[in-house]
Swiss-Prot record:
It comes from Homo sapiens. Residues 1-90 are annotated as: Disordered. The gene is TAF11L11. This is TATA-box-binding protein-associated factor 11-like protein 11. Residues 1-10, 37-50, 72-90 have a biased composition (Basic and acidic residues). One of its GO terms (biological process) is RNA polymerase II preinitiation complex assembly.
Length: 198
């Protein structure tokens, strides 16, 4: 029988690779003693049987395909399943909303949906302001925020144009008035901020 001290000594002389463990019987790693011991429980037997069935099916289906392509194939299937789908209630709500829109609103919505700020220019602008490099994720987030901001300003400018009884090609005066109206709402920061001394 091996004492704890002898086992430590043998472990120091012959280090085991990570992930391998000693078996309870004779110190042979569990991963390597498949022929020496019988399976301990039926779960491991079922798992190995399932694995064998899966690998046999893969070998029969595509024997000439390299293993990396098989892995990529299964990864893409998993990603497709995880993609969130729109439920029926949400789809009904969207169709109701689209049917209520006028042609002008629908075309404006489509243009707004397709538009985007160039990420490279946003990143360059942010880098010139901060003096540090900007990650791609930060540039993408800032481009999204800028798109929302422009949408709010344009929507407010259209409201101003309608209130003044003018037709929709927006003019600079409409945009200026929209920005002036958005400042008190807290959407725009105050650019003329003066530090109060006392």
């Amino acid at each position: 029988m091996e004492t704890g001290r002898q086992r430590d000594a043998s472990a120091e002389m012959f280090p085991m690779p990570r992930g391998l463990k000693y078996s309870n019987k004779d110190g042979i790693p569990e991963d390597l003693d498949g022929n020496l011991e019988e399976p301990r429980d039926q779960e491991s037997e079922l798992r190995s049987q399932d694995v064998m069935d899966l690998t046999e099916g893969d070998n029969e289906a595509s024997a000439s395909t390299p293993p990396s392509a098989k892995r990529q194939k299964t990864d893409t299937k998993g990603k497709k399943e995880r993609k969130p789908t729109m439920d029926a209630e949400e789809a009904q709500r969207m169709t109701t909303l689209f049917s209520a829109m006028s042609e002008e609103q629908l075309s404006r919505y489509e243009v707004c949906r397709r538009s985007a700020f160039p990420k490279a220019r946003i990143a360059a602008l942010m880098q010139s302001i901060t003096g540090r490099s900007v990650s791609e994720n930060t540039a993408i987030a800032m481009a999204g925020i800028a798109k929302v901001f422009v949408g709010e300003v344009v929507e407010e400018a259209l409201d101003v144009c309608e209130m003044w009884g003018e037709t929709p090609p927006l003019q600079p005066k409409h945009l200026r008035e929209a920005v002036r109206r958005l400042k008190p709402k807290g959407i725009l920061p105050n650019s003329n901020y003066k530090k109060i001394m006392f």
